[in-house]
Amino acid sequence: MRHGDISSSNDCVGVAVVNYKMPRLHTKAEVLDNARKIGEMLVGMKKGLPGMDLVIFPEYSTHGIMYDTKEMYDTASAIPGEETAIFADACRRANVWGVFSLTGERHEAHPDKAPYNTLILMNNQGEIVQKYRKIMPWVPIEGWYPGDCTYVSDGPKGMKMSLIICDDGNYPEIWRDCAMRGAELIIRCQGYMYPAKEQQILVSKAMAFMNNTYVAVANAAGFDGVYSYFGHSAIIGFDGRTLGECGEEEMGINYAELSMGLIRDARRNGQSQNHLFKLMHRGYTGVIHSGDGDKGVAACPFDFYKQWINDPEGAREQVESFTRSTIGTAECPIEGLPNEAARS
């Protein structure tokens, strides 16, 4: 893991993250014009960072947030489509991989159902290698249709990569699912705003450590007329230590070289902090000393996860028993969301 140079090597993937200024757009033409700006930024960055293998742009960087529902549906993208064609041209010209946000992607039943909040991982030939739909839209505000699975794909130089989006990162299950699929770099694109700066910086570092994985965070910056975005795009080592981090500046860039050999060695030879291995070999020292085998315990000890798999409605009722039974809350109502007062 190296930070401070502009190079890379056969062992190291050069990764850049961008504090892209949150745009405020209204039409398809404006979205396409902004996509071209992203493409030109990518090409320009490669001139300054010759080792850059992968550049990551934040959630909402292409479309901005469409606060008007009609605009949100009217500007929703097909994938592949006009926006991805622009990105593909830029990736080919720069010989660089990219992660790009499409908010939204048209639902299969468009316009009868809400769009998805989608990320794509595109290779240096302009081909879409991974398309990820946000599993945990930021309710109650975001109106995206939720996705239903994570993915792992071979990225530049063969590094295993997963995409997650913003509020996804507040759920440890998503990180663990990516890591247990073999992800070596989990890419979190976000459009996170104040007041959650401290928590979001903390959670990405903690999840890198807990999942023995590199993490790259690309976050928006600036003010879009509604929210103020705190930036702090960052690249984090698999030991949870920050390699490089932007401040709050608009269009800030940070860059680091991520060694594949180091993370693979750590996962193979690490012991006390090898969380992925230890989770599936629980208590192996005591089990071995007790004569009960040489692998530890593999069985899941967590009742909640067992119930969630086998009885999702029952698991939901259990959570509602100590939270609330309606989507909304009468003490801070949001239009369109049922709450206890409305129900009564």
Curated annotation (Swiss-Prot):
Keywords, ordered alphabetically: Hydrolase
User: Has UniProt tagged this entry with the keyword Hydrolase?
Assistant: yes
Q: Which reaction does it catalyse?
A: a monocarboxylic acid amide + H2O = a monocarboxylate + NH4(+)
Positions of the CN hydrolase domain: 13-260
Please give the Pfam families that the UniProt record associates with this protein. Answer: CN_hydrolase
EC number(s) for this protein?
Answer: 3.5.1.4
Q: From the record, give the transmembrane residue ranges.
A: none
- Asked if the Swiss-Prot or TrEMBL record annotates the protein with the keyword Hydrolase, the reply is yes
What GO molecular function terms would the record report? amidase activity
Give the active-site positions: 59 (proton acceptor), 134 (proton donor), 166 (nucleophile)
The family database entries (InterPro entries) matched by this protein are listed as:
Aliph_Amidase/BUP, Aliphatic_amidase, C-N_Hydrolase, C-N_Hydrolase_sf
Source organism superkingdom: Bacteria
Q: Which CDD domains does the entry mention? A: aliphatic_amidase
State the family named in the UniProt similarity comment for this chain.
Belongs to the carbon-nitrogen hydrolase superfamily. Aliphatic amidase family.
Entry function: Catalyzes the hydrolysis of short-chain aliphatic amides to their corresponding organic acids with release of ammonia. Also exhibits in vitro acyl transferase activity, transferring the acyl moiety of short-chain amides to hydroxylamine to form hydroxamates.
Protein name (record): Aliphatic amidase
Q: What is the lineage of its organism?
A: Bacteria, Pseudomonadati, Pseudomonadota, Betaproteobacteria, Burkholderiales
